Amino acid sequence: MAENQSTVENAKEKLDRWLKDGITTPGGKLPSERELGELLGIKRMTLRQALLNLEAESKIFRKDRKGWFVTQPRFNYSPELSASFQRAAIEQGREPSWGFTEKNRTSDIPETLAPLIAVTPSTELYRITGWGALEGHKVFYHETYINPEVAPGFIEQLENHSFSAVWEKCYQKETVVKKLIFKPVRMPGDISKYLGGSAGMPAILIEKHRADQQGNIVQIDIEYWRFEAVDLIINL
């Protein structure tokens, strides 16, 4: 067993040197496992374990059916701020992109979303889902919920604008983050597919409650981030 472990460690060191030499740049795709094994003289099963160890150290990441990639620089995320993902990414010299996958109404209102109907009752909520990417690699998926009785027509106004911009321009509300919840989770299969991952991949869940000037919760965001893609920074 010790010999097997030593063999895996040796393979991991070879791969580590490959990464440090910059043969594949951040965000770039590694050769296939067969090609890597031939290039580095590593057996297939040993190579797979070494790759998994490097993934656990956030040095590489997988995309389902697309192979292994070198981890990009982590995105510095301050979730307590109202700055949009686009603006924060550009300020860090990154190339952001994003998109919506659904904009609809839902009558399924679990206890987590109860603050949205505490002041203004409603039997439905707007549900908006989407993703964000850096340099073409998707790094997070989000679900956003809003009470249509508080902000009628919000999903029609959204288009490609930020949520905070729509609140200010169309509803004259300035929103601030009032509550944050962080959880390490295994990503559900229906969500991981949007990020090119597989069911059960490790992720960081961020639940964000946004309030208006009166302190009423008007928006709840639930975000799933690839664990190797983000550093969370809270400014006190």
Swiss-Prot record:
Q: Name one Pfam family in it.
A: GntR
Q: Which residues bind DNA?
A: 33-52
CDD domains under this entry? WHTH_GntR
Which positions carry the signal peptide feature in this UniProt record? none
One GO term of the biological process aspect:
negative regulation of DNA-templated transcription
Q: For the HTH gntR-type domain, which residue ranges apply? A: 5-73
Sorted UniProt keywords: DNA-binding, Transcription, Transcription regulation
Q: Does the keyword Cell membrane apply?
A: no
Question: What Gene Ontology molecular-function terms does this entry list?
Answer: DNA binding; DNA-binding transcription factor activity
User: Highest taxon of the source?
Assistant: Bacteria
Listed name of the protein: Uncharacterized HTH-type transcriptional regulator YihL
Q: Which gene encodes it?
A: yihL
